[in-house]
Regions:
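N-terminal "arm"/small-domain region of PLP-dependent enzymes with the aminotransferase-like
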Residues: 1-26, 31, 247-249, 375
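Active-site PLP attachment segment
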Residues: 170, 183-233, 259
């Protein structure tokens, strides 16, 4: 067999939607993008959604709209992909990395609390593998620390505390205590990249909660300005007969979503619940088969359900990169693509150059050293899942010299 790690699930429905966009004569930001925004907002139970070309763009635009700048600090996880932190550098603020907690892949919340000071403006929690972070705990911490918060503009003043921006690149469709991903943090950024549960090839979206004293329509327009060069009209409005006149309000960015991208998303969203259900089936089969072999992510419980984006397995009996990589090699020999999520940021050249040292993040390193991500996607057949299970158990047994490590 040849099993890919995370191929996009594209059906005739997606193809038909894209063809419809191509034939419409309007292929950049237009009616399909606006409809996709409406459907995302409805799905997430939020007043607005802003479609962009990536989750990274979403994170950065939120920081810019909040006025985060040089002299400010933003806290995020050391155990994440670079996008969670690089956007902080982009706006000129200081990156503050927090080690992982012993349980799961979220930040160590006690350490996170200790990192908050008068310069802290935003915290970016990361929903690793599709599981929503413990926002009850996070909100308690920022409320307790609100006396330290020093707003530098009117929008920050509206919050009166450190602002929460969810890196929810993995968690679109996840639920916690009856609330959707997108309903928890003040702002939430989703990814629709090709490897994500719901894809638009490239793409992302920002949603936000109602903020006291802030008109959601005005906030939406602020995102529109930032996403299209600060232009007062989008392309669709500007192209109406006789309506060419526009203004550049500020020097914005260029990160809008196109109707071709939105077309894929509209088709995916129609069948997304079934896609989530299939992911849950595969996760349940993995969990049952690997009892005693790994430390898994707890994706489902009485009052929460992740989006089932990644199957992260920490292998018992392995505590080194060398042995973990040996398992990866054996899986490759079986024709199975695997991955590692994540190499902690302090191990990368860019973050070393900023002064970070992995020795200061021992829990993140320990989780990384024995973690392997198995294929988890909606194109997997039951036969392929059985084969992955068989090969993984065998590979781990050969490396650990123990078929079922305790």
């Amino acid at each position: 067999m040849n099993i890919k790690f995370s191929p996009p699930d594209i059906t005739q429905a997606e193809i038909d939607e894209v063809v419809d966009a191509l034939r419409s004569g309007w292929i950049t930001t237009g009616p399909k993008t606006k409809e996709f925004e409406r459907q995302i907002a409805a799905y997430c139970h939020t007043p607005k959604a802003v479609c962009l070309n990536s989750a990274t763009a979403g994170l950065e635009l939120v920081l810019r709209i909040l006025g985060v700048q040089k002299g400010d600090e933003v806290i995020t996880s050391a155990y994440t992909y670079t996008a969670s932190a690089s956007v902080i550098e982009h706006v000129g603020a200081k990156i503050v990395l927090c080690d992982t907690g012993e349980d799961g892949y979220e930040m160590d919340y006690d350490k996170m609390a200790s990192l908050i000071n008068e310069k802290t403006k935003v915290i970016i929690p990361v929903d690793i593998a599709g599981k929503i972070c413990d926002y009850d705990k996070i909100y308690r911490i920022v409320e307790k620390k609100k006396s330290l918060f020093k707003p530098s503009n009117d929008l920050q003043e509206k919050f009166g505390r450190v602002i929460l921006l969810a890196d929810a690149a993995h968690s679109f469709g996840a639920v916690r205590h009856g609330k959707m991903s997108g309903e928890w943090a003040d702002f939430t950024s989703f990814s629709f990249h090709a490897v994500k549960n719901l894809t638009t090839a490239e793409g992302g979206a920002v949603v936000f909660k109602n903020i006291d004293g802030v008109d959601p329509d005005e906030l939406y327009r602020e995102f529109m300005l930032w996403s299209l060069h600060g232009q007062s009209k989008d392309a669709l409005s500007k192209m109406k007969i006789g309506a060419w006149e526009y203004d550049i309000k500020m020097c914005g960015q260029k990160c809008n979503m196109t109707d071709i991208m939105a077309s894929i998303g509209l088709a995916q969203l129609k069948r997304y619940d079934k896609m989530l259900a299939r992911r849950r089936e595969i996760i349940n089969r993995y969990d049952e088969a690997f009892q005693g072999l790994i430390i898994p992510v707890e994706h489902y419980g009485d009052d929460f359900a992740s989006s089932g984006h990644l199957y992260l397995a920490r292998i018992k009996g392995i505590d080194s990169e060398t042995d973990r990589n040996a398992v990866i090699d054996k899986m490759a020999g079986c024709g199975i693509a695997t991955n590692v999520h994540y190499k902690p940021l302090p191990m990368h050249t860019a973050y070393k150059s900023l002064g970070f040292d992995i020795k200061d993040y021992p829990v993140s390193y320990a989780k990384y050293a024995n973690e392997i991500s198995l294929p988890l996607h909606t194109l997997l057949t039951d036969e392929e899942v059985d084969y992955i299970i068989e090969c993984f158990i065998k590979a781990v047994g050969e490396v650990t010299k123990n078929e079922r490590p305790d």
